[in-house]
């Protein structure tokens, strides 16, 4: 096709679709005895895009992975936490199966399966949620519960969570309604006290009350493109009953609440059961026995707990698990740094003793897997600073002494006569 303004005879040309003349449009494209203007081309593109949006959800729903497939995908990125992965796989599968069947099956209304993740910091709560969203190819957003307040107070409104989700999918409401929202630090909005107070708890119980309807399912009115609300404005209507909410928190001290409940009734005085220290359950074993009544005592209101029917507990990561995290997942930390070094033409080797030292440091800091990156970054900082300016470095070797800060990484050069250790 060619761009023409006049035919060979010099006659005025018109768009065959809208009838506008060549003087009313910017471009006129000629085909075999027909013409189309740039405006009609744009309109056709818009129609095709809308058609694709409508077809895409049906295509995604037909390819819903089974719980086994979801679990297998999580295994590629998350080490350990086997029970939590199984619980999540079933809950997520059931949620999207419910959406695919229009919330009903043979006339039976299917309930919503929001999820509560309980586990220490750095145990993989956020990573599990992110990995699920990536597998299902749905919009994902994170919110920090500590920044939320009731409407009308200084802080983030709970509806801002839905606004963030819309931003992730370019304000496509249909796509947002199939998304996943992860609310972190949910334990920090627990009720501050069991006793009623004359001062309003706007960041604790107040936020729980504000989140109730959002999590259960309501039609949230969100201003388009992140604008502020005003009366004359048209709002985007988002049905949150189709959005999967995953709430996570460390719940420090919950193990003591569970322990008190479990041990109550074991007798008092001479009838009490005496337990040795070795007989006492670990924190992970206690958290696995969590009941709604324990969460109520911790400070969550019963209505809020009722909106999170699926509870998964995560264990504190052991030293062996941290070593696995360093080298086994598809996006393992050591693989990431090896890829960075390969861009500079150098091979990066972590000796086993170095991985042990990194895991020991992370255990001592009690930061779980989250602390691994900062330890590796500190050990490699000087090398990453110098390497781009150095020639012929073929290999960088990291051993235990480098992690402990006692020596610098061993640099191996391409030319035998130039081999040297930077720590010498």
UniProtKB/Swiss-Prot annotation:
**Domain named ClpX-type ZB: residues:** 2-56
* UniProt keyword Metal-binding present: yes
Q: Which UniProt keywords apply?
A: ATP-binding, Chaperone, Metal-binding, Nucleotide-binding, Zinc
Is the ATP-binding keyword given for this protein?
Answer: yes
Q: Which GO terms describe its biological process?
A: cell division; proteolysis involved in protein catabolic process
InterPro entries cross-referenced by the UniProt entry = AAA+_ATPase (IPR003593), ATP-dep_Clp_protease_ClpX (IPR050052), ATPase_AAA_core (IPR003959), Clp_ATPase_C (IPR019489), Clp_protease_ATP-bd_su_ClpX (IPR004487), ClpX_bact (IPR046425), P-loop_NTPase (IPR027417), Znf_CppX_C4 (IPR010603)
Which residues are ATP-binding? Answer: 120-127
Name the PROSITE patterns for this protein.
CLPX_ZB (PS51902)
Q: Where does Zn(2+) bind?
A: 15, 18, 37, 40
Highest taxon above the source species = Bacteria
Instruction: State a GO cellular component annotated for this protein.
Output: HslUV protease complex
Question: Sorted alphabetically, which CDD domains does this protein's record hold?
Answer: RecA-like_ClpX (cd19497)
Q: Quote one Gene Ontology molecular function term.
A: ATP binding
Pfam families to which the protein is assigned, alphabetical:
AAA_2 (PF07724), ClpB_D2-small (PF10431), zf-C4_ClpX (PF06689)
State what this protein does: ATP-dependent specificity component of the Clp protease. It directs the protease to specific substrates. Can perform chaperone functions in the absence of ClpP.
Similarity comment: Belongs to the ClpX chaperone family.
How it assembles, according to the record, is: Component of the ClpX-ClpP complex. Forms a hexameric ring that, in the presence of ATP, binds to fourteen ClpP subunits assembled into a disk-like structure with a central cavity, resembling the structure of eukaryotic proteasomes.
Report the protein name in the record: ATP-dependent Clp protease ATP-binding subunit ClpX
The gene name on file is clpX
